Amino acid sequence: MQNHTAVNTAQAIILRDLVDALLFEDIAGIVSNSEITKENGQTLLIYERETQQIKIPVYFSALNMFRYESSQPITIEGRVSKQPLTAAEFWQTIANMNCDLSHEWEVARVEEGLTTAATQLAKQLSELDLASHPFVMSEQFASLKDRPFHPLAKEKRGLREADYQVYQAELNQSFPLMVAAVKKTHMIHGDTANIDELENLTVPIKEQATDMLNDQGLSIDDYVLFPVHPWQYQHILPNVFAKEISEKLVVLLPLKFGDYLSSSSMRSLIDIGAPYNHVKVPFAMQSLGALRLTPTRYMKNGEQAEQLLRQLIEKDEALAKYVMVCDETAWWSYMGQDNDIFKDQLGHLTVQLRKYPEVLAKNDTQQLVSMAALAANDRTLYQMICGKDNISKNDVMTLFEDIAQVFLKVTLSFMQYGALPELHGQNILLSFEDGRVQKCVLRDHDTVRIYKPWLTAHQLSLPKYVVREDTPNTLINEDLETFFAYFQTLAVSVNLYAIIDAIQDLFGVSEHELMSLLKQILKNEVATISWVTTDQLAVRHILFDKQTWPFKQILLPLLYQRDSGGGSMPSGLTTVPNPMVTYD
């Protein structure tokens, strides 16, 4: 893609995501305080504040909410520029029109983020360098899409231009890892973690590491060599672990090893020589308002959750047929003398070795693709899956039906027992053969949510999650509607709807037609599940009868974020019209 085309495309995408987020979340009453009218057949949302007026062309989406009709221009009263409207310019206009609210918003922070997001997306579109390995290519497309419908997703706060160049998967730049020696007395690990696996990674530099430690009067036998992300090594560890470094509990060694490429998550790094082996390490820049740490308790919780997932796969016929799980039990972490697992510091120095199912790694006839990659605005993966360049409407409808059917069958089969895996598109992968879904592969198990009453009803043991007693947690749920909210928001309104959105843009298939198909599949799959008898009607009511569904707010919480955000993406819940209800 030529540079000027890429710049215009990137600006249009970020503007669309911004306007959609404002509309979805009704920020500053942009929907509720507007007049809806039609001009020349186009629906317009007319928003007036402080004597200024904006006309936004909109359409009624399959989510039963207005979205920006981006093929038509937004009109800002008094604006005379012939240049296309940018997201940053539109945001500044909204802020200026709402001085009573915006004095509490992080206006400049958001404006900076929108500008950076557009700049980086333009670069990634113009310099997209696809890997030859189909799985790695899928990760690049998932990274290119990033978090669907999030206008600031492309901003990685804390990175310089040179960092984006190396650490964005789209640009296909591999890099070596650095090394920190961690004293064995200050380390914990997964229950079944095999230290040999970790040591095998650092074999190429073990001799040098031994000599360097000897030079400081230290013995390699007292330490474990941790792989460290080079950005983390340079910018974070010297400060966050200054005391431990002075006490030789942590020794930073200027050694490099291996050849790795960022995955779509940026923390999980793909071994170029063995693409189905990933090393997950902290990378504490800020993305989506959260620091990309890998807290120790998350890995412990992931280990517990993985046991539960495997137990359910053995128990359930549909899960046994369709689901495979990445092995994420091999992990190690620095641990202070106080054994305080809730310390933020720990999340800066951990490592996890993720292994994909061997049967997939050895199968050259399958394509393993994350659902997030299918939401990228590019035909390449669809052509690869279907095995042809010219894809008809019937082809893409059949493919979407297959994807939705398997995904919903798997998800609801887990949910009937009271377990809900991480459902956003980055962490659900689909294995295709001959254009059909064969397997659903789960990764990143640290946020498998549970509904205690259903686990108990099925005589299943509760995972021993490490959670703070003094703050709310999202892992353990006692309320059925709260449990289902994660499915409604992440699985349907984000993951599946993002794929619907991409198919509409790429192949011209109406999103309403695709959503109608999705509704029918969901109804069929819900009907086949053996829900806990006393809750059957409640499930149908939550999904199909209620007038509203929960909806994840992503922009509004960022407007009020004053700090680094810690390790969790700021979000809130609001309610929106139920997308499973058809409105005339």
UniProtKB/Swiss-Prot annotation:
Keyword ATP-binding: yes
Reactions catalysed: 2-[(L-alanin-3-ylcarbamoyl)methyl]-3-(2-aminoethylcarbamoyl)-2-hydroxypropanoate + 2-oxoglutarate + ATP = staphyloferrin B + AMP + diphosphate + H(+)
Pathway annotation: Siderophore biosynthesis
Keywords: ATP-binding, Ligase, Nucleotide-binding
Catalytic activity, EC: 6.3.2.56
Origin: domain of life: Bacteria
One BP annotation, GO: siderophore biosynthetic process
InterPro entries in the cross-refs: Aerobactin_biosyn_IucA/IucC_N, IucA/IucC-like_C, LucA/IucC-like
Bridged cysteine pairs (disulfide): none
Sequence intervals crossing the membrane: none
Keyword Magnesium: no
Recorded GO MF terms: acid-amino acid ligase activity; ATP binding
Induction section of the entry: Up-regulated under iron-deficient growth conditions. Repressed by Fur under iron-rich growth conditions.
Quaternary assembly: Forms a mixture of monomer and dimer in solution.
Entries under PANTHER family matching the protein: L-2,3-DIAMINOPROPANOATE--CITRATE LIGASE, STAPHYLOFERRIN B SYNTHASE
Family assignment from sequence similarity: Belongs to the IucA/IucC family.
Protein name, as recorded: Staphyloferrin B synthase
Species name: Staphylococcus aureus (strain NCTC 8325 / PS 47)
Gene name of this polypeptide: sbnC
